[in-house]
């Protein structure tokens, strides 16, 4: 375990995730200066032509009003750092079967994208969401695969919330619509997580990662 490399990664990940959160909030019409009014469309809200779950959006607005913009950026970045590194650690130690972070062979994409339909958490989803996931996979564009991946990660987090509620929250919270983009690109944060955590991650590695992340 190379602590120098871990520290550098954790600090870079923090900065990158915070920037991703700012970008995502901007898309959602949320800035330091306030919140643009969203259009309510049934159980969703429309912002700049895109639809988002109303429950998650309302949770985000409440959080913004409660802690402010900068703290929201910090907290949401830390939330996703914790979740992604925890998933990688659980995979590396075979606590979960799905490859939510690690890839198969030479492919850059996480293995779950190719065989999500084989796993129990997918089979437990309602038929409408299952169809949406299949349609996204069949569309096979960069945007559709990224959306497919974000939904799969969120649904796996939902499943894990039953046994690890301190790490993985149930759907409907503000973090759902702040899923970090660009994770499937080459040299993305996801690739660096794989490199740092590796295939046989000792438990103390996670502790060091969190310590280094919070050292800034």
Q: Positions of the model-derived regions?
A:
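Preference for the N-terminal adenyl/adenosyl cofactor-binding alpha/beta module
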Residues: 1-216
């Amino acid at each position: 375990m190379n602590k120098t490399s871990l520290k550098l990664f954790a600090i870079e990940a923090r900065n990158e995730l915070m920037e991703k959160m700012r970008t995502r909030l901007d898309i959602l019409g949320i800035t330091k200066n306030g919140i643009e009014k969203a259009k309510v469309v049934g159980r969703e809200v429309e912002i700049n032509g895109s639809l988002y779950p109303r429950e998650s959006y309302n949770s985000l607005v409440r959080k913004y009003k409660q802690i402010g913009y900068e703290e929201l950026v910090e907290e949401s970045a830390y939330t996703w750092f914790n979740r992604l590194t925890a998933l990688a650690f659980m995979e590396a130690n075979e606590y979960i079967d799905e490859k939510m972070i690690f890839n198969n062979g030479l492919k850059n994409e996480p293995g779950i994208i190719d065989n999500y339909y084989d796993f129990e958490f997918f089979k437990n989803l309602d038929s409408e969401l299952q169809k949406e996931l299949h349609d996204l996979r069949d569309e096979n564009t960069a945007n559709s695969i990224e959306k497919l991946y974000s939904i799969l990660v969120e649904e796996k987090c939902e499943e894990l919330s039953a046994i690890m509620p301190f790490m993985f929250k149930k759907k409907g919270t503000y973090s759902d619509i702040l899923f970090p983009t660009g994770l499937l690109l080459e040299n993305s944060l996801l690739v660096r997580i794989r490199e740092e955590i590796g295939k046989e991650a000792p438990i103390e590695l996670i502790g060091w990662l969190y310590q280094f992340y919070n050292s800034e």
